[in-house]
Amino acid sequence: MGRYAREPDNATKSCKSRGSHLRVHFKNTHEAANAIKHMPLRRAQRFLKNVVEKKECVPFRRFNGGVGRCAQAKQWKTTQGRWPKKSAEFLLQLLRNAESNADYKGLDVDRLVIDHIQVNRAPCLRRRTYRAHGRINPYMSSPCHIEVILTEKEEVVAKATDEEPTKKKLSKKKLQRQKEKMMRSE
């Protein structure tokens, strides 16, 4: 079993999943993973399915050189976006695996949130392409490692309201003025 970059805060309420040496572009997968970070599991799965169907785009923020603009990126408050289909499918597969791990652990699947997702570069695979005049150029691929930690979200308890409203705290000057007014009125 490999090490994760981060361990969950509460191991009993979390589940993990990882994939190594995946033949999918690192840069596209990095952007797609950043888009679904801290999303609820069901929303992340729906988002990735929409990316495959080109109904929602993945915003490209870091690796955005030469990336075209699209109107769907406006909901992310950016202009550049793409639909990395293969990356979305790999992430969906990983989330499905993490979901089955959570189900096995007895966690409530509908309350799971993507607490941690990280994409790292894997060693490049080398191929070759043949050029004019007998030359050979490299034809590299950029695979990646992906790790996901899902955590069951705790229910937020509403703060109890006090019956009597708290009085505003006054500064020393204002307190002094109030005392002077009281003295004058007497």
From Swiss-Prot:
GO terms for molecular function: structural constituent of ribosome. One of its GO terms (biological process) is cytoplasmic translation. InterPro entries: Ribosomal_uL22, Ribosomal_uL22_CS, Ribosomal_uL22_euk/arc, Ribosomal_uL22_sf. Transmembrane segments: none annotated. Residues 177-186 have a biased composition (Basic and acidic residues). It comes from the Eukaryota. Residues 159-186 are annotated as: Disordered. Keywords: Ribonucleoprotein, Ribosomal protein. The keyword Protein biosynthesis does not apply. GO terms for cellular component: cytosolic large ribosomal subunit. Belongs to the universal ribosomal protein uL22 family. PANTHER family: 60S RIBOSOMAL PROTEIN L17 (PTHR11593:SF10). This is Large ribosomal subunit protein uL22. The gene is RpL17.
